[in-house]
Amino acid sequence: MSRTNLFLLLLVFLAGTSCNKQQHFISDDAFRAEVEKDFQAKQAALPNGNLFSVFNQQMTPDEKEALTFLYAYMPIGDITDYDGQLYLDNIRSSFRARVEMPWGDSIPEDIFRHFVLPVRVNNENLDESRMVFYEELKDRVKDLSLYDAVLEVNHWCHEKVIYTPSDARTSSPLASVKTAYGRCGEESTFTVAALRSVGIPARQVY
């Protein structure tokens, strides 16, 4: 075999190996196995109903691993009270933001997993705010640095919701937009949801 043919054969082999190597949402093998174990325990604890039927849908390996992570660690009430499609839609929107926003590749995997991907912020009702907010915010922040994008999202939140004392219940992000007011916990929940919608890690701090 000539040296040229040997080189070409090596290139084909390497290309095939690269194509067959599965990309994981959770790159650490040990942690991925731990998540799967915890997910199976959650399934075993909730055997009745079709609470995990969303996993029967066609999805990418990344989407399935992200969904498995959410279900493994979300409160049981969030599994029983909400359709799984809500979580899958949120995952797909968060992945879209990671691809389309200029800072997406710079967010570490574990930070993205814990502070961008989750739907819940506090004790609010869950809604489709991530998808709604992304469509409204993406053009305002897509050409900004991460620092300036955080400021711009904060300005946008101020345009939408003002502070007003209320009761102890926490309104959902979309409900806060509808009423245009919220107490401190509601405003921070709203802001965290807005930041996460464009792929910026965020959480409440007390």
Each PLM stretch: what is its role?
Residues 19-154, 166, 176, 197-198:
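N-terminal accessory/pre-domain segments preceding catalytic cores
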Residues 173-181:
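Conserved short loop/turn motifs at secondary-structure junctions
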Residues 162-164, 181:
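Aromatic-lined, polymer-binding surfaces characteristic
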